[in-house]
Amino acid sequence: AATMNITNFQQMGGTALGGMVKNMDASNMAALGDAKLVDMTKTMDAGAFSIMGGAAVADLTKTMDAASLIGLGGGKLANMTKNMNVNNFKTLDPTRILNMAKAMNPANFATMGGTAVAGMTATMDTTALTGLGGAKLADMTKNMNASNFAVLGGARIKDMAATMNITNFQQMGGTALGGMVKNMD
């Protein structure tokens, strides 16, 4: 990978590249440098990230420069993070996770799905949750069900609910809001 450029990565295709990156650890990824990681990531699609799995995606995410990661855009970030679980997210810097969430839109959160959104949200503290604001939290939580909210715990759910207003709750929809309330203590 160190001797390849973006054209070479494109010639490999996303599937082969995903398999290659899956077999690298975080130190190997860091040794490649930010520019190479960005080129590799831009070449991969949702299928390649699925081949990599959540742990390898987390390693890729934490070794990439924060600005470059956000520069990939919400769609790419959603395809990456939908393969991550709460334990994968916990290996990342909370500020990085917050910035990733800020870069995503409602369609990106829908792509991630409730389990990945819950994993992302479970790593955020009160400051991060309030920093996102009610509208962004509504975009995230409308993709979650009662089981997803259970991962968060009552205190985190309380922080989220305190940040949201009636319009945000309406945007969530009844099913998601019911799952949220069910898991409050």
Regions found by a protein language model. Name each.
Residues A2-A31, A35-A58, K62-G71, G75-A78, ...:
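Thr-biased low-complexity repeat/linker tracts and other Thr-enriched repetitive architectures
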